[in-house]
Amino acid sequence: DIKVTNPEGFKKYQEAVPATIAKHGGKYLVRGGDVEPKEGDWAPTRMVVLEFPNMATLKKWYNSDDYQKIIADRTDNSKGNMVFVEGY
C-alpha cells in the first residue's frame, strides 16, 4: 500500500527498483492498477505485490546495498505500509 506524495521525486525510485528486484530473483505480481476495497476500513490507493523465491531471498534483497541506496527515494516521496508474507 503506497501513496505517492511527490511523483517527480518518486520517479527515481520507480526507475531504479526493478533492476534490484530482478537481480535478487524477485518479480512483480501487481504494480499499480485499480484498487477496489471490498471489506474493512483499509482504503489503499496503490498496491505493489512482489514475489521472491523464499523469505531469505526477500530479506537479502531488502537489506542489499542496491536497495538500501534507493530506499530514501521511496520513503521521502511517498507514504505507505510494507509487510513481508511467507506463503505459497
Regions found by a protein language model. Give the residues of each.
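C-terminal structural segments of small proteins and small subunits
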Residues: 55-83
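Short S/T/G/P-rich N-terminal loop/turn motif that feeds into the first structured element of a domain
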Residues: 1-46, 51-63, 86-88
